[in-house]
Amino acid sequence: MATTLATDVRLSIAHQTRFALRLASTISSNPKSAASNAAFSPVSLHSALSLLAAGAGSATRDQLVATLGTGEVEGGHALAEQVVQFVLADASSAGGPRVAFANGVFVDASLLLKPSFQELAVCKYKAETQSVDFQTKAAEVTTQVNSWVEKVTSGRIKNILPSGSVDNTTKLVLANALYFKGAWTDQFDSYGTKNDYFYLLDGSSVQTPFMSSMDDDQYISSSDGLKVLKLPYKQGGDNRQFSMYILLPEAPGGLSSLAEKLSAEPDFLERHIPRQRVAIRQFKLPKFKISFGMEASDLLKCLGLQLPFSDEADFSEMVDSPMPQGLRVSSVFHQAFVEVNEQGTEAAASTAIKMVPQQARPPSVMDFIADHPFLFLLREDISGVVLFMGHVVNPLLSS
């Protein structure tokens, strides 16, 4: 796959990573989400908004493209095509991660999708397009969309559309769903899992199960008051490489400032990716499970995306509308599920709407003790596409 990624697509991936880090910083700075564990899927949100941009015109399209950072709307479509066909292709039959991703466009029967939009949605995004009856069967359509998402995510995301969120005024729903389940290349022995203290942001502590490594070394980098752990997943027969990264600030209360630094310095993440294994002395990583949902409109508005939610929105490239007024976005529902244990990671999400500088030589022996709040992300390393990201402030909290 590495040879199939054109320069413009690689640039779009870099912008998608920047979009992910801006989202993470905004979520971490929100008092409500900062006080709990959080998880989201940048690639799910990015894909949904990119498809939305395909149906937008004039200033609305320009604002979506600026928020996504794809440079031009075609860059988002090229990225989506690569993501759907290569990055998120299932690898389970060859012994790699189980990956499933799907896009859906559900449009009221009173409207017709423009042929150009429908063709792009189907060909580039591999989207299903369905004509539905929001006007008289809104509850049934809600169940239909929720069941579709639940199936794609192997039951992990059950109600992406909350009860009552769709009614007879709804005209169109864009939805996607992502599922990932991978086993670590080097699995942890459950016999080595023991309870220990995890220190919370308020200075108190809880006892939680910590996994320990039976290996003599791990992929770890350490600099700038930050330790980063890389945990690779077993691969299939292609050249993709999925990994989870644990970003542990030295300061127990350093989560928010770390998220800000990641957002402010585009190359900060890449500079701190571990590229060699180092000998370890003590190693402790808590098991965690996160189920996180949000209505993301306000979050996106904080990133500068205003027009799609306003009466000045222009989605004239999406539908042939018999209505005197156009369409606007009313809600963006997003849910994510991430579980990390001794065997590997299970994760799901849904959204409705290189030459590298050398690293400093690491110490001969290093500790990695994740006993205070940290960030995590799951990405495909060859392309750099970030599938999931979030933070853990208390491993005992699941939602």
From Swiss-Prot:
Pfam families: Serpin
Gene Ontology molecular function, alphabetical: serine-type endopeptidase inhibitor activity
Keywords on record: Protease inhibitor, Serine protease inhibitor
Record GO cellular component, one term: extracellular space
Positions marked as site (Reactive bond): 358-359
Keyword Lyase set for record: no
Bilayer-crossing regions: none
Keyword Protein biosynthesis listed: no
Region described as RCL: 344-368
PANTHER family: SERINE PROTEASE INHIBITOR, SERPIN, SERPIN-Z1C
Annotated family: Belongs to the serpin family.
Function: Inhibits chymotrypsin and cathepsin G in vitro.
Free-text domain note: The reactive center loop (RCL) extends out from the body of the protein and directs binding to the target protease. The protease cleaves the serpin at the reactive site within the RCL, establishing a covalent linkage between the carboxyl group of the serpin reactive site and the serine hydroxyl of the protease. The resulting inactive serpin-protease complex is highly stable.
Protein's UniProt name: Serpin-Z1B
